[in-house]
């Protein structure tokens, strides 16, 4: 992805590669660095979007191609329609689509996770504003969080037998959908 030189970058691309959930192409974009927040609950959090790099996120959601970034989360609309679970609360047609469109227009700069980690010094990072952090290598997130004041994230992948609990437990909490899951 070539940076459009007419514009100031909106954020950083820290990973472009295969999804660890299904092998499809994904991208991780870090943005909202130094941005103020109106969210009284979380305060200012640097945002991270895990999205398909080859498909508009609304289309990915409609076709089930969002499995690359959400795995078997029961809140994916394509699964929620069958299970009766409430669909994901993220409005993909707004912020996620805006991030994807900016990515396609070249508004984000490629940078290593270690480089971006320095920009995040003393800040709080949200792992997976959209998408599950476990779609990408855990080392990406370990590098990004090395200087942060704090980070928050959830993963539905913790029930997957290949999920590295030891590595991920320092980064994300299990996203539990039932009381039984929560006490597991």
Go through each PLM region and give its residues.
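Class I S-adenosyl-L-methionine
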Residues: 1-184
């Amino acid at each position: 992805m070539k940076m459009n030189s007419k514009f100031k970058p909106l954020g950083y691309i820290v990973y472009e590669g295969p999804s660890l959930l299904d092998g499809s192409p994904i991208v991780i974009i870090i943005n909202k660095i130094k941005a103020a927040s109106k969210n009284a609950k979380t305060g200012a959090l640097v945002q991270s979007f895990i999205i398909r790099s080859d498909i508009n996120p609304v289309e990915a959601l409609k076709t089930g191609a969002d499995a690359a970034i959400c795995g078997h989360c029961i809140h994916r609309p394509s699964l929620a329609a069958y299970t009766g679970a409430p669909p994901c609360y993220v409005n993909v047609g707004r912020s996620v689509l805006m991030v994807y469109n900016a990515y396609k227009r070249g508004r984000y700069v490629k940078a290593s996770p270690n480089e971006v980690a320095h920009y995040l010094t003393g800040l709080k990072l949200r792992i997976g504003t959209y998408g599950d952090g476990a779609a990408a290598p855990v080392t990406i997130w370990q590098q990004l969080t090395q200087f942060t004041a704090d980070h928050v994230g959830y993963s539905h992948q913790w029930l997957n037998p290949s999920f590295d609990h030891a590595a991920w437990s320092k980064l994300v909490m299990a996203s539990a959908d039932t009381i039984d899951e929560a006490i597991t």
